[in-house]
Amino acid sequence: MAPAAASGGSTLPSGFSVFVTFPDLLFIFEFIFGGLVWILIASSLVPMPLVQGWVMFVSVFCFLATTSLMVMYIIGTHGGETSWITLDAAYHCVAALFYLSASVLEALATITMFDGFTYRHYHENIAAVVFAYVATLLYVIHAVFSLIRWKSS
């Protein structure tokens, strides 16, 4: 974290220090658990398309946005600008709220699964709920520490 701060005045890491600084190392876990959520939902029969459509939107959007941010941090796109700290905090707050709503809706869709769905699809949806709540927790933690970083910048 010190090299990024020394080079441009930013507390955002660049290069591979993204993978060793907190809270930015959470990108890896957000990427993994977010990807698992949309893969599990896509592979199951969708019992409530409208509800799970929102869950798919949130998980794919956050997966792509997290991947984009992580790549931009690695290549140093932020260039030491403090506006990137604001962007980071805002994104993670929005992602945490979106994922919380998606987690609750996925739990609702799983609870209300009716006859005609196999146990395999039911278990895939249960796993998607668990991973969605893990992703929510990761985004909340990242949002809190990004807000702390934003306030101190």
UniProtKB/Swiss-Prot annotation:
Record key words, sorted: Cell membrane, Lipoprotein, Membrane, Transmembrane, Transmembrane helix
Record's signal peptide: none
One record GO biological process: protein insertion into plasma membrane
Topological domains annotated Extracellular: 47-53, 115-125
GO molecular function: structural constituent of myelin sheath
Compartment list: Membrane; Cell membrane
Membrane topology note: Multi-pass membrane protein
Membrane-spanning residues: 25-46, 54-75, 93-114, 126-147
InterPro entries found in the cross-reference section: MAL, Marvel, MARVEL-CKLF_proteins
Induction comment from the UniProt entry of this chain: Up-regulated during myelination.
Posttranslational mods: Lipoprotein.
Main location: membrane
Residue intervals of the MARVEL domain: 18-151
Cited PROSITE patterns: MARVEL
Physiological role: May be involved in vesicular trafficking from the Golgi apparatus to the cell membrane. Plays a role in the maintenance of the myelin sheath, and in axon-glia and glia-glia interactions.
PANTHER family referenced in this protein's UniProt entry, alphabetically: MARVEL-CONTAINING POTENTIAL LIPID RAFT-ASSOCIATED PROTEIN, MYELIN AND LYMPHOCYTE PROTEIN
Entry protein name: Myelin and lymphocyte protein
UniProt organism field: Rattus norvegicus (Rat)
